[in-house]
Amino acid sequence: MKKIAIDAMGGDYAPKAIVEGVNQAIESFSDIEIQLYGDQSRIESYLVKSDRVSIVHTDEKINSDDEPAKAIRRKKNASMVLAARAVKDGRADAVLSAGNTGALLAAGLFIIGRIKGVDRPGLLSTLPTVDGSGFDMLDLGANAENTAEHLHQYAILGSFYAKHVRGIAKPRIGLLNNGTEATKGDSLRKEVYNFLASDSSLQFIGNVEARDLMSGVADVVVADGFTGNAVLKSIEGTAMSIMGQLKSAIAVGGVKAKFGALLLKSSLYDLKDTLDYSSAGGAVLFGLKAPLVKSHGSSDAKAIFHTIKQVRTMLETDVVGQLVEEFSKESDVND
């Protein structure tokens, strides 16, 4: 049985969206147990009772405006902290939260801990492509500043995730840059390019541009945390803007527009599904000793369900256990 600890109080619509997502997951998957951390009375008002769901009550939670590291240290009984502690103590196999991103990353690093050999775990998410296959990108903001060695390791981590979680035999690795030529970019990008090009274990395809990401140019895209986060927000904003513009155009377009929308209904739903990044799950802080997944702060029940599904896949494939073994081999070689 796969045990998942969930911060029920994190996110814009907690605990309602969190608990309703849990209800869907419990109904869909018979091999998971959920531990919900938070206000018991509020959780119970939305929970469909199940012997595979338990509640650990706490009145304390980390707010969106709390300073991450201080909150983790001072709010020792916060729902997020208790969920992370359950993983560290072996009472749960993975942790999920839609709460304060910085605090969750701090909980991952300070409570769960890094895998030996991983310098800086990267925040990885699967983002949409027009053909529906998606691509993995990291780092999405766990680290504002990176060295070339960090980005090389992100490529290794991303390739490993794509292979073991998404089932891509030879993931194509692209380096996000301001042009596709090998000579493009600043000194950091040029140094990273040389690292990746000389690593025979990676299927490195060269530099990729932001405009080509959603066309599926690569299976894994490597970026420093600052740039990756900016691109992530751009993709999210573009997806929301496109759907908003379509709705607005149909609403004010009169009878012809509404009739046209009716004829295109299935195609519009397909477009909506293609642009819906939440269906791929949350962002993984990959490189920790256990799966830690951040769901979007505005996640609804559907997004929480898909994030639980993602965590279940990570546990089913034992991707973290295999990653520990992989880095253990590298450490032995380096020693």
UniProtKB/Swiss-Prot annotation:
GO terms for molecular function: phosphate:acyl-[acyl carrier protein] acyltransferase activity. One of its GO terms (biological process) is fatty acid biosynthetic process. It is found in: Cytoplasm. The keyword Transcription does not apply. InterPro entries: FA_synthesis, Phospholipid_synth_PlsX-like. Pathway: Lipid metabolism; phospholipid metabolism. Its EC number is 2.3.1.274. It comes from the Bacteria. One of its GO terms (cellular component) is cytoplasm. It catalyses: a fatty acyl-[ACP] + phosphate = an acyl phosphate + holo-[ACP]. Its main location: cytoplasm. Pfam families: FA_synthesis. It is an enzyme of class 2 (transferase). Keywords: Cytoplasm, Lipid biosynthesis, Lipid metabolism, Phospholipid biosynthesis, Phospholipid metabolism, Transferase. Belongs to the PlsX family. Homodimer. Probably interacts with PlsY. PANTHER family: FATTY ACID/PHOSPHOLIPID SYNTHESIS PROTEIN PLSX, PHOSPHATE ACYLTRANSFERASE. Catalyzes the reversible formation of acyl-phosphate (acyl-PO(4)) from acyl-[acyl-carrier-protein] (acyl-ACP). This enzyme utilizes acyl-ACP as fatty acyl donor, but not acyl-CoA. This is Phosphate acyltransferase. It comes from Streptococcus equi subsp. equi (strain 4047).
